[in-house]
Amino acid sequence: TVLNLDIVAKVVMKLLPEKGPYVLSMDRTNWKFGEENINALVIGITYKKVAFPILFKLLDKRGNSNCEERIEIMQRFIRLFGRESIACLVADREFIGEEWVKWLNDWCIEYHLRVKENFWVEDPRTGEEKRVKSMFIHLKDKQELVLHRIYRIKGQLCYLSGARLKNSDGVPELQILISFSRPDLALSRYKERWQIESCFRGMKSSGFNIEDTHLVHLERVEQLFGVMIISFTWAYLVGIKKDIEVKAIRILKTGNRAISVMKYGLEHIASVL
């Protein structure tokens, strides 16, 4: 029996603890078995420090996704749930390209995408070009700047905003974003992007251990992914309920939970099966 992945996405959407419109986070995850590379482009719906994976596309290649693949997965989301269900889309520096940003602009989809510091930006009023980094280089640590004029990057008109923030290694770096509209929201919205990485950790090592399956045939991996998406959502919802109604998850001195909500729910499900 072949699992219908559109139905999987609709089931997950029905199970979500909040109704839309939603902040979508697009990212890519990969794992390797010997010489085999499994590469997945994923759209997740962000919610309280996690992202629920809703759609994915397995890429039969190594490396980044291309514009066509990103457009295809977004078109699928719109076909299933409607454009009105999208509050905005956030994505990292990998997800930039003229054709891609043009498609988002044409569909009037609010987005907040990070760009590389060395990109050229043009002022459409004067034709002046400069590196986008030069517009934010003066920012001090934790300082933010929103530019309320429209600029052109990669041939497309957009708004710009930026901040100097510490990266995962604790080193301050510029975070520069392009937006379709509402640049004032860009930096706060973009903070939700990392929630999809929590989802990937749950899939890989913090719960489902997908890499231990050693599946390499894309058709089989695709079916497993579909089952795992439903299971991930179910485990998270059980974890929320148990945390609230049965026993709260212990909070560490750092302020973090001793165990993730998803893993808390997964362990409970495993104990009763």
Predicted regions and their residues:
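An active-site-proximal beta-strand-loop segment
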Residues: 27-40
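Single, function-defining residue in the core of a domain
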Residues: 2-10, 17-22, 33-36, 47-273
